Amino acid sequence: MILRKKIELFVLPEFTEIQFEGFHRFIKYGLVKELNDFPKIEDTDQEFEFQLFSRQYQLAEPPIEERDAIYQSITYSSDLYVPAQLTERKKGRVKKQIVFLGSIPLMNSQGTFVVNGVARVIINQILRSPGIYYNSELDRNGIPIYTGTIISDWGRRLKLEIDGKTRIWARISKKRKVSILVLLLAMGLDIEEILGNVCYPKLLLGCMKRKTKKEHLQSTEDAIVELYKQIYCIGGDLNFSESISKELQKKFFQQRCELGKIGRLNLNKKLNLDVPENENFLLPQDLLAAVDYLIKIRFGIGVPDDIDHLKNRRVRSVTDLLQDQLKLALNRLENSIRQAIRGANRREHLPTPKSLVTSTPLITTFKEFFGSHPLSQFLDQTNPLTEVVHKRRLSSLGPGGLTRRTASFQVRDIHPSHYGRICPIETSEGMNAGLVASLAIHAKVDNWGSLESPFYKISGVSEEEDMTFLSAGEDENYHIATGNCLALNQTNQEEQVTPARYRQEFVATAWNQINLRSIFPLQYFSIGTSLIPFLEHNDANRALMGFNMQRQAVPLSKPEKCIVGTGLESQTALDSGSVIVATEGGRISYTDGRRITLLTKEKEVETKLVIYQRSNNSTCIHEKPRIQLREYVKKGQILADGRATAGGELALGKNILVAYMPWEGYNFEDAILISERLIHEDIYTSIHIERYEIEARVTSQGPERITREIPHLDNYLLRHLDESGLVLPGSWVETGDVLVGKLTPQETEESLRAPEGKLLQAIFGIQVVTAKETCLKVPLGGRGRVIDIKWIYQEKTSTTYAEIVHVYILQKREIQVGDKVAGRHGNKGIISKILPRQDMPYLQDGTPVDMVLSPLGVPSRMNVGQIFECLLGLAGDFLQKHYRVTPFDERYEREASRKLVFSELHEASRQTANPWLFESDNPGKSGLLDGRTGDIFEEPVTIGKAYMLKLIHQVDDKIHARSSGPYALVTQQPLRGKSRRGGQRVGEMEVWALEGFGAAYTLEEMLTIKSDHIQARFEVLRAIVTGELIPKPETAPESFRLLVRELRSLALNLDHIIVSEKELRIKFKDI
């Protein structure tokens, strides 16, 4: 194969570029535009005039650094200052001041926003582009209905339709519609103009004939009145007035007919109009052209639109979302200033610009947006890959978008226009499948919100190949060769037949017909999917699971890079911000665990390292230096590794020696058997940091106090507290230990009920105020080492005084039975048993296997990539090599992956003199010995080095047992859930199981005493303490009494009657 001589080489883009570019556009253009649009404000008497000089705005530098904002739990933001002028026209006085409009949260170097000390990310939304879309559908009777939907920039819609009787309507709502003639006349057109600009004017004439003389519309005024009556459902006679016209303009035309720049471009292109781009509203001629096109489609001229095509969608990035919020905030500010000017007019003193402008609208609007908007999300910080993927996410949900329940399968499905723009594999599992997607590696968003993908142009004249970016609508008319086919030999390329894409179809065509070719085999996939080696050998569903589980991988205390990868690991780690890189060349003058100092030619650069910091997902963020003192480094060289990185590469898991074989049923149903070596050598040990919070407020009875003096509790529980009542850093705390001592004053009435309180008040007249303890204690499963205590917030105002204390506890978790582990190919399982090393199956050189996987998990799941990976990993382990294999290597030759694996295994066998590594009779398999008996297993077994991940689904977070705890007030049954110390109900099927075994007494206990029999509970406790027999309950349980009460509330009386056998007397007894 001979490659072309001159090719413009591609480089991988920065993975978080979409976030930085979006925020840059907001600061540079969006902010200026919205400030420029702020109007001059006058009072009703036109005595005062207020205006902002938006071009001279200033954004102040943030007063603190990003890291300090996280530590102090405040927002990393910049203050916005704008010069303002207030003019008093009567006296000719002018006051100019620089006013503070508010704070705008700033994007940090990671591409996220720090709001109240928490990292948040703004998701890019993908939704219908404003414009017009035509469609045809069948009604209930099977008659085709042709529709044209005009989507405004606000997301509101105006629907035109031709029904089965060829009448044309404009639909106002689901139930109401108005004749198109009424709407066109109301917009200012006359009948002659309407009929002269549509094909088949008979259709519109037919609409006119159906109207009686009384209903016939003579003028625009009549049409406006008719439209107003239809929209507001008003009957009877109504006369035209200017107020009706203004109301219609405001409520109907302005909301449904504002197209925006993108909508105007789309409409001009679709309907072949020549309207200026700055005309953002729907004009009468636009609607007339839309009706004309709809009539043409009815008669077979023109093609309906594909709603799901990406050319009909646009991406709302950070720019648009923040600009919308700024617009809303400035509207609120405008209303506030108008009210302030009105108030100042009534008073005598002259206001100043500073007294009129308040920062509240801007601050509260952005606070609401970042706190509660569905597209502003809590950054997923489980590992570095998760952060990068979260920033590149595309969501169809949110305001103006789709909803989980109403979205159809068609919307969720993969579309041919997604190729190279949206990853066909990466999406959520469950309700959000297909609605939340991810950008492909090389995709980017242009200024109009369209997704673009790069291609090489192929020219017959020149040998050069230039790169060009095309959107989804632009590449339809080209033959595009796929990225996983090689450039062909120059001599016979014209004779070669190449697979290509053309007009949303896959075709085979001659090379001389090809116009463009893809630049990279992984161009179609997202970052997470591209990290799966031998991706082409996996079923897409398992690849999806493999990616989703990489996002859930917990950073380990000793990271290890994979033997078999795809080559994208280093850039993923770099773009996530987890590794620290030298910004300039120089010499390391100082390094320790907390900082690195680099001496360059001009200056000394100090970099602070992050030490044991908690992430949003309670995993540990920790950076370790990789360089030595006095070492010379180049620009771009790695100075420090972060969590889940090793040598500057992403390292989410460990290379583990695995065997695919059954072992005594312990790997039934995907369960996994592991060696105790993984525990003793801390191979799967991870560090987790939990944060516990307590707040001391001023209550109506007095202030809450943080103190060490807690008389209610045993001194043993308070042993770790210092003099001020806070736990000492470095203390090892167990469940129930007090972290922060706090006393809350009780109400006086409650204090009076205590006998000693009454006595003291009667004798000495002392009012006794008692306090109850509301200490912060270590919850169940929260044991660990206290690493930090923060007084986060201390604010004194006229009404409140609050103190917030955060306590951070570090836990070191080893792998254990019940933890979930997974590979990169969707092969997941739960640890079922931990075996001693000597009992594990071992190789012919005596090495015990670390993990035993079920072989039945491979054929039915069709994820054969894991076998290629583990065999190549085994060869790499013996040869001391690392492999970076780009997926789709079959483009070189058939069976390329298999040939690579077997050749490397053969080479490893030859170099290490281990013939069992590659046996020609059973390639890829080897004889394995039983660790318990020393006998060889009957069948050869597939063994290899697989890269296995420990996932965040850990048994410590999930397992829960209850001996006693709280009960629900109504049913008197135990509460539900681990957080409430609840229990589990015995349901119908569990009762059947106990009945089947005849466990009558156990069943009775579960349904009464252990569940909801209040009286029996106390009797059982007394019987256990005194050693008596447990009495049989005589009364009904609470759930039965509840049922009776509910029946009584429905006027159905249910009584308990006892009939005496001797006297035959009836005795009523309350249930």
UniProtKB/Swiss-Prot annotation:
SUPFAM superfamilies, per database record: beta and beta-prime subunits of DNA dependent RNA-polymerase
The record, for CDD domains, names: RNA_pol_B_RPB2 (cd00653)
What are the recorded Gene Ontology BP terms? DNA-templated transcription
EC main class here is transferase
Cellular component annotations (GO), alphabetically ordered: chloroplast; DNA-directed RNA polymerase complex; mitochondrion
E.C. number, please? Answer: 2.7.7.6
Q: Which reaction does it catalyse?
A: RNA(n) + a ribonucleoside 5'-triphosphate = RNA(n+1) + diphosphate
InterPro entries per the UniProt record, alphabetical: DNA-dir_RNA_pol_bsu_ext_1_sf, DNA-dir_RNA_pol_su2, DNA-dir_RNAP_su2_dom, DNA-dir_RNAP_su2_hyb_sf, RNA_pol_bsu_bac, RNA_pol_bsu_CS, RNA_pol_bsu_protrusion, RNA_pol_Rpb2_2
Instruction: Write out the entry's keywords from A to Z.
Output: Chloroplast, DNA-directed RNA polymerase, Nucleotidyltransferase, Plastid, Transcription, Transferase
* Location in the cell: Plastid, Chloroplast
Q: Which GO terms describe its molecular function?
A: DNA binding; DNA-directed RNA polymerase activity; ribonucleoside binding
What quaternary arrangement does the UniProt entry report?
Answer: In plastids the minimal PEP RNA polymerase catalytic core is composed of four subunits: alpha, beta, beta', and beta''. When a (nuclear-encoded) sigma factor is associated with the core the holoenzyme is formed, which can initiate transcription.
Relate the protein's function as given in its record.
DNA-dependent RNA polymerase catalyzes the transcription of DNA into RNA using the four ribonucleoside triphosphates as substrates.
| Assigned protein family | Belongs to the RNA polymerase beta chain family.
Q: Please state what the protein is called.
A: DNA-directed RNA polymerase subunit beta
Q: Which organism is it from?
A: Anthoceros angustus
